[in-house]
Amino acid sequence: MLFRSDECYSMIGKPEIGYKLEDGVRMAKVLEKEGIDAIDVSCAGYDTYNYWLEPTSFEPGWRKYMAAAVKKEVKIPVLAANLIRSPKQAEEQLEEGIQDFVSLGRTHIADPHWVNKVKAGKEDEIKRCICCLYCMESMQKNAYKGTHAHCSVNPKLGKESEHPIANGNGRTVVIVGAGPAGLMSAEVLAKRGFKPIVLEKNAFPGGQLQLANKPPLKEKINWCIEDLVTNATHYGAEIKYNVIADESIIKSYNPYAVIIATGGKAIKPKSI
C-alpha cells in the first residue's frame, strides 16, 4: 500500500510532512525488486483519514492517477480501489490501463452481491455505497459493545445469518410513504411473498432524502433513492404516487397489514 501523504497533509494545512507520489513510485519499484507479487495502491494515513476512506463529497475515481503512476513503472500486477462505485467505472479503469485488479471495500458492504449481479447482467439492481461513512461510525461506536457495524443502504449487514420467512402467500400489505423506510419495507415484504403497495402523497419517491440531497456535494444520496425504487419494484412492489392514504383508500385494498412509514418528527433539543 502506498501513501501519497504529502498531498493529503497539505489539504489539512500541514504541508511537507508526508512523502510525495514520486517517492511512493520509487518504493514500489524497490518492493518489486524484493520479490512481492502485487501491489495495492492507496493514499493518506490515519491522521489524514478522509483521503483514504472518503466521505460523500469525493468523486469516484479521484485518485486513480496514483495507481496509473505506479502501473507505468512496475511489471507486477497493480490493485487499486479508487473509490469505484459502478461496474462501468471499474471496467473503464481496467481498459485504460490504470490498474490490473479492482479492489472493492465499502462497495461490498453496501451490496455483498455486487459481483454476482455484475456477472448476471443485473447492474441496475446494485445498491451503491453513498460514502456516508455510517459503517465506520457504527464500527467505532459498537466495537466496545461487541456488536456489528451498520450500513445506511444495507440493513442486512451483520445479520446475514437471519433469513426472513417467506410466508406472504400473496397477501396485500399497504405501506404509507415512499421514503427509505417504506421502500425498504416494500422490498423485504416482496421477497417474502407479500404483495406490497406503497402509497405516496408526492409525485416522487424519497421522503426526507429529498431534503438531504439538496446541499452541495450530496448528490450521491440520489443513488440511494434510485436503488431503493429499482429493487422494490423489481421484486414486485407497486408504488402509487399522488395518493393521499386516508382510511377509505387503505381499506379499499383490503390489506393484511398496514405500515406507516411517513417519516420521523423533528425534535428541538431543550438546550437551544
Name each model feature, range by range:
Residues K29, A68, V229-T230, K251:
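Surface-exposed alpha-helical segments enriched in charged/polar residues
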Residues E59-R63, S103, P216-W223, I239-K240, ...:
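Short, structured secondary-structure boundary patches
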Residues I98, G121-K122, L217-K218, T233, ...:
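Short alpha-helix boundary/capping motifs
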Residues I130-Q140, A166-N167, Y235-I272:
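FAD-binding core/adjacent interface of flavoenzyme oxidoreductases
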Residues I175-E238, N242, I267-S271:
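Beta1-alpha1 glycine-rich phosphate/pyrophosphate-binding loop at the start
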Residues Q89, Q208, I249:
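Phosphate- and divalent-cation-binding pockets in alpha/beta enzyme and binding domains
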Residues M1-V176, P180, M184-K191, P196, ...:
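Flavin-dependent oxidoreductase catalytic cores
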